Amino acid sequence: MNLQQQLSHCQQHQHLLQLTHFNHETAWQLGEKIKQQAELQGVALAINIRVNGQTLFSYAMPGTCAENADWLRRKRNVVELLGTSSYAAGLMLQQRQTSLEERYGVSLRDYAALGGGFPLQVKQAGIIGSVNVSGAPHLDDHNLLLQVLADFIGLPAGSIELLAPLTE
């Protein structure tokens, strides 16, 4: 899959992976599902769900460290700045042959355009926050979020095409 195809898939994913509602209980349920999927895949993740500037779910699985929490913050900052997944942001920057620093004037110490951050979007309301994970390779972080969100909103298994590493 080339860069343009991946960007197109990312746009489709964001359009499809919208929730009908979201509240504190929903955040807890989504966070638990992410934890369960990570356990099934044998990866240790730090997980953060944030809505309107408030953390509604935060969990660090055994095997994670403070560095993972920092990656969560940096990925979340990209989602909040650009309103798209942190993975899609990285693809857009790559396509434009630029960086977060050059295009937006932000520090890479505070922003990371790598997979693992995804906007929480509610139908008829728009983006209300983000769900973020860190602990696996960044494309795996992104794909895990796609899998869990698709299942969480009740999409049929296999209806979301997971992303593979870029090819030319």
Curated annotation (Swiss-Prot):
It holds the Pfam family HbpS-like. InterPro entries: PduO/GlcC-like, PduO/GlcC-like_sf, YBR137W-like. Belongs to the UPF0303 family. This is UPF0303 protein YE1367. The lineage of its organism: Bacteria, Pseudomonadati, Pseudomonadota, Gammaproteobacteria, Enterobacterales.
